[in-house]
């Protein structure tokens, strides 16, 4: 996959017929895309050819749709390709799509597309055995009347399996425009002596600017949280302006994460800033407007146009409890007033900046529908739907895919996974227990290793890339730079606290860049 650029508007035209690059005009035809043509299970399905361990590829009953599917399985180790070449194509970009699933053992199953300029590949993500996922891969054809080869590949240990169904080849390019990292803890880390190093595989472990390291590995955006009056003097508007300037110098776009609190805000805690504690609803509305405008203008003063601003953080339960809560008691009209004030402030500061509304539990479609049905009924404007998705808390990829696809279709808004992470180890590097530190918390197929961390992020990006009509923007890896630095703990009122997150950062316990960072290069 090709690297895209996150500049100007945070939303670049994406994929599938509306790509920023010219889409091919030809409508390709895949023969026997659902493996139904033979009417029974066969060794070699009509329209497809095999190579490698040919006995490991066959069709059988149990399709994602229809009756049959392509399956790869063998009692011994195997490597097999089942492919089809589509000819007579015009020059341009093409995207292959397939529904797939695989076992969780040693099993490199993938969808490949070769249009003559090299093989592009998307791996089949790990999911429960009964869960099909749709994945996509794009490649460019550089000559008229050319051809593209769709390849369904498996290299696996004996007994491991993969299934494929409903193959498509369509004109256009499915490329993510946001490959981001939350670096909210970075400034405080640096102030307390934190250092960051390139990975030893390619850069000899040189000490460098963390933002430059991220950008060199393919990241094109950062996310910065903003508290109103934090106890430790970090994560405030002044720091936002400084980090925004540094991000611009490093070639990174900026997403502003407004918490509307003096400390952490999430579904369970949406505490008003102390200075706003006794405000009326009218005063809170004005305070939201003023704070949002001030945050945005602080960046503009540094020559930075924020690509996106999110109004609140994980606001399933609302903001500014209890006045803006969605339950106990529900105050949807008040919440709508606050969000409308924030939206107005962003657009006054920068009309092209996108406004995001962000919920937790990215695979919970019922909650997302309930929340956005209520907020749209109140007439709240917004541009992007953001979702937190941590696989160990929020479940497998299937519900995430269903929810992202549904949000894009139901509300006509682009979607982004705005928080995600996974551990590279179960060890710890300070005196604070880690948020994820037990083997029982891990997901089968994603070990707590550098490779498991990278595979987890890769597969989440694949799900966002597959959102139809280019409506999936990308993802931000949460607090990628939060290594264990004394003084940079989770509690802004307690300098002795640890961070509980160092085993999920994008830098290891020696502050070296981890392989997960390479997933920024699609």
Give the ranges of each region predicted by the language model:
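Extracellular carbohydrate-recognition regions
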Residues: 25-50, 173-183
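Extra-cytoplasmic beta-strand recognition segments
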Residues: 35, 80-107, 135-139, 167, ...
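Extracellular glycan-recognition surfaces and repeat-rich motifs
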Residues: 36-76, 209
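Extracellular carbohydrate recognition and processing domains
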Residues: 116-146
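Aromatic-rich peripheral "rim/lid" segments of glycoside hydrolase catalytic domains that contact
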Residues: 191-192, 406, 425-459, 463, ...
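Aromatic-lined substrate-binding rim segments of carbohydrate-active enzymes
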Residues: 206-265, 273, 329-352, 400-410
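Active-site cleft segment of glycoside hydrolase catalytic domains centered on the general acid/base Glu
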Residues: 236-239, 266-382, 395-404, 490-499, ...
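Glycoside hydrolase catalytic-domain groove-lining segments
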Residues: 354, 365-443, 451-452, 458-466, ...
